[in-house]
UniProtKB/Swiss-Prot annotation:
Keywords (A to Z) from UniProt: Cytoplasm, Methyltransferase, rRNA processing, S-adenosyl-L-methionine, Transferase
Main subcellular location of this protein, as a coarse class: cytoplasm
Gene Ontology MF, one: rRNA (cytosine-N4-)-methyltransferase activity
Listed InterPro entries: RsmH (IPR002903), SAM-dep_MeTrfase_MraW_recog (IPR023397), SAM-dependent_MTases_sf (IPR029063)
Top EC category: transferase
Coiled coil: none
NCBIfam families assigned to the protein according to its UniProt record, in alphabetical order: 16S rRNA (cytosine(1402)-N(4))-methyltransferase RsmH
Gene3D superfamilies assigned: Putative methyltransferase TM0872, insert domain, Vaccinia Virus protein VP39
Entry keyword S-adenosyl-L-methionine: yes
Function: Specifically methylates the N4 position of cytidine in position 1402 (C1402) of 16S rRNA.
Protein name according to UniProt: Ribosomal RNA small subunit methyltransferase H
Length: 331
């Protein structure tokens, strides 16, 4: 396949912000890592734009099974790696670019049996890798206080205590096992949404999915891994879909670009102060009217892009970049 050829027209997934992403990181060449392969939209876009090779990472083995039909067309230009993007520096080094799309794959949302959607009935699962405790395990065993904490900090759900109380009361009668069962329970705790507002269960499902898959830990570790894996001049592009993860990415890049400030601005810059990234866009890039018309899913998406400098990789405190802190403990 030609390096400049457009992605195949039968692509079932519309990658969010692909056009502005490719424009922001142009020219595309060398070795890139797509840390959230999903349906392969970004990978195909990068290969079509001129990447010599893309290392595609996904924790869900089904993603690679579904891509097998078209992936072979790219030969050794496409390398598939089952795993998590927080370990990308174990899979590759001296990368020319890293792309992370933090949204849920449309493939996973479309499969009722994966348990991500409150619009389709299925087992209350939500595991991206299909390993470890499921959302049903969490909902049916966590304490009321822990459930409220997760819903509030991970989903920014103001009615977290009310919903947690309802969950504990309901599961005392019978286990909560399906997506629609949980969605109906959440709906019963909240006012009916006005036209144009999101489904009442949106925030609760987001919070539980994040908890089940340790998504904030994965994002924090992934940003640090990208810093280690990128070569000087390498580009990092991250697409976020809600305020908490965007805040984490924004603060991380600001801190690593030296915008968190030195103790004394007149003091000489030290090796420790040297920025690891240069911001390629001061503000997040959002969808234009054309993309919103083509793909309503893009309405909340934000893209942030940065360039890796030659400063040594370092460490960052998770709390300092706005990672939610649960009372019971993660980071």
């Amino acid at each position: 396949m030609s390096r400049t050829a457009a992605p195949p027209s039968d692509d079932p997934h519309i990658p969010v912000l692909l056009r502005p992403l490719l424009a922001a990181v142009a020219p595309v060449s060398g070795i890139w890592l797509d840390g959230t392969f999903g349906a392969g939209g970004y990978t195909r876009g990068l290969l079509a734009a001129g990447a010599d090779r893309v290392i595609a990472v996904d924790r869900d083995p089904l993603a690679f099974e579904l891509a097998a039909g078209w992936a072979k067309d790219y030969g050794d230009r496409l390398v598939m790696q089952q795993g998590v993007f927080s370990r990308m520096d174990e899979y590759a080094s001296d990368l020319d670019g890293v792309v992370l799309d933090l949204g849920v794959s449309s493939m996973q949302l479309d499969l009722a049996e994966r348990g991500f959607s409150f619009m389709k009935d299925g087992p209350l699962d939500m595991r991206m890798s299909q390993e470890g405790p499921s959302a049903a395990d969490l909902v049916n065993t966590a304490t009321e206080a822990d459930l409220a904490d997760i819903l509030f900090h991970y989903g920014e759900e103001r009615a977290s205590r009310r919903i947690a109380r309802a969950i504990v009361k309901a599961r005392a009668e019978a286990p909560i096992e399906t997506t629609l069962q949980l969605a109906a329970l959440v709906e019963s705790c909240l006012p009916r949404p006005k036209p144009g507002q999101s489904h009442p269960a949106t925030r609760s499902f987001q919070a539980l999915r994040i908890a089940v898959n340790a998504e904030y830990d994965e994002l924090f570790e992934g940003l640090m891994a990208a810093e280690r894996a990128l070569k000087p001049g390498g580009k990092l592009a991250v697409v976020t879909f809600h305020s908490i993860e965007d805040r984490m990415v924004k603060r991380f890049l600001q801190a690593r670009a030296g915008r968190s400030g030195r103790a004394n601005r007149y003091a000489p810059e030290t090796v420790e102060d040297a920025p690891q990234f240069e911001l390629l866009s001061r503000k997040a890039i959002g969808p234009d009217d054309q993309e919103l018309a083509e793909n309503p899913r893009a309405r909340s998406a934000k893209l942030r892009v940065a360039l890796r400098t030659d400063a040594p990789a370092g460490a960052v405190d998770a709390k300092s970049i706005g990672m939610p802190q649960l009372k019971g403990g993660t980071r």
